[in-house]
């Protein structure tokens, strides 16, 4: 059996899809389905079982027997960078992750988890997987950073793979449930469908992000499992591109429209990453040779999926 937490979420459901594609359907999905609309992310995929996230961690703590587990992909978390309830974040993103990590270590189960480029904060260079380059700007980023630090403490003694991925700006299919946290491509497409022009913040021509297609993210996770990879790695394309490039790809797909600029919101000032670019040196050194879709390639594929 394979366990995927956050399996109804964007990255989790794409990992389920990637597992199905290699013939694995013996998957236990763990999630919080309070937002029932997320069910659509797995409706075309095959899993063996579902468990509520709180029931699951209670079973872990109680020492219940789950049978033979080949891997745990821990994608479940509060992913809202605008969330400032620190107690909630630390419970969901830190304490929960620690319990699951120790369960995997105790049973020698390969453990793969979602970290985030938010751990780097507002820096404009050196996105390298080392403590000296990490200074998160928000509570979400801090919760992810703290778990990375915890993993660094236990890694030297681990007898089974423990692997974290600092996801950069992930976009693509199965994110419609995320609301304001969905990718800019998703929101721009919705604006176009309403007959509006795609809207970007003023100054966005200078905002560069490492936009990585979600199917590429899932591929790296599967590769890490199949190759027993341990460590903490950046997961982006290694090339920053502009929000303008995303908007242009959406316009090109629809064959109409032009970019409109809107004021930059006050609540994001000083808490906004204006540049991100994954340094892939460590991932490549670990042996990953796969390519990553460009914004033009990934957005075109995503638009076709959204507007199918």
Curated annotation (Swiss-Prot):
| Catalytic activity entry | ADP-D-glycero-beta-D-manno-heptose = ADP-L-glycero-beta-D-manno-heptose
Instruction: Tell me one GO biological process term.
Output: carbohydrate metabolic process
- Class of enzymatic activity (EC top level): isomerase
Q: Does the keyword Isomerase apply?
A: yes
Which Gene3D superfamilies does the record associate with it?
Answer: NAD(P)-binding Rossmann-like Domain, UDP-galactose 4-epimerase, domain 1
InterPro entries, sorted: Epimerase_deHydtase, Heptose_epim, NAD(P)-bd_dom_sf
Q: In which pathway does it act?
A: Nucleotide-sugar biosynthesis; ADP-L-glycero-beta-D-manno-heptose biosynthesis; ADP-L-glycero-beta-D-manno-heptose from D-glycero-beta-D-manno-heptose 7-phosphate: step 4/4
Annotated positions binding substrate: 169, 180, 187, 201-204, 209, 272
Q: Which cofactor does it need?
A: NADP(+)
- Which Pfam family name is an example for this entry? Epimerase
**Which GO-annotated molecular functions does the record name?**
ADP-glyceromanno-heptose 6-epimerase activity; NADP binding
Explain how, and how many, cofactor molecules are bound. Binds 1 NADP(+) per subunit.
Q: Where is the active site?
A: 140 (proton acceptor), 178 (proton acceptor)
Superkingdom assignment: Bacteria
What's the domain remark here?
Contains a large N-terminal NADP-binding domain, and a smaller C-terminal substrate-binding domain.
Q: Which PANTHER family match?
A: ADP-L-GLYCERO-D-MANNO-HEPTOSE-6-EPIMERASE, NUCLEOSIDE-DIPHOSPHATE-SUGAR EPIMERASE
Complexes and interactors = Homopentamer.
Q: What family does the database annotate? A: Belongs to the NAD(P)-dependent epimerase/dehydratase family. HldD subfamily.
Q: What is the annotated role of this protein in its UniProt record?
A: Catalyzes the interconversion between ADP-D-glycero-beta-D-manno-heptose and ADP-L-glycero-beta-D-manno-heptose via an epimerization at carbon 6 of the heptose.
User: What name does UniProt use for this protein?
Assistant: ADP-L-glycero-D-manno-heptose-6-epimerase
